[in-house]
Amino acid sequence: MSEVERAGGAAKRLLLLVPMVVEAAALRRAVPGATVLRTGVGPARAAAAAVKASRLAGAAVAVGGFCGALTDDLRPGDIVVASEVRGSDGHGVRCSSEPLVAALRERGLQRVSVGPVVSVDHVVRGAERAILAAGGALAVDMESAWLAPAAAGRPFAVLRVVLDTPAREVTRPLAMLIAGVTAWRALRRAGPALGAWAAA
């Protein structure tokens, strides 16, 4: 179920959409003043949350969270800023990427890649990653394309942090824990850039 949280602080320009509780925990304090909406995981919950989010205040809308890399050029903890998000139907929505990348780099975060993020309705493993990568996408998630309508004409950005890669898929609990901690820390470090992007 979706849940709205308000972070402390004065800047209230950003509506931040995050699928999971752990992602919200990473970003809540990192983006003071943002309205944080936990959307739930997967397309059905994301689509329902987008309807709710479209009615919430915020001059800018961003999606933050984890993703799977589609290429081994990326590694766990790397930041992916979407140039566009693509649904499983191939439809794409352009994102505000350059100002966000600049804000990240101003904060010393250099492991940042920009490119398409594709959203699907299932966990992607094995050869399917290569198929999606062949279409030019850098990363995969299960929500961003369904959350995009929430922007409703407002600036829209997607910031995802790599959880696993084709060569380092997380299928065991210990591997998931290690990768999760790495991704969580990177997401927390990236959070202030989202606030700067929204305030620009």
Enumerate the language-model features and the residues they cover:
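A short, flexible N-terminal coil/short beta segment enriched in small residues
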Residues: M1-L15
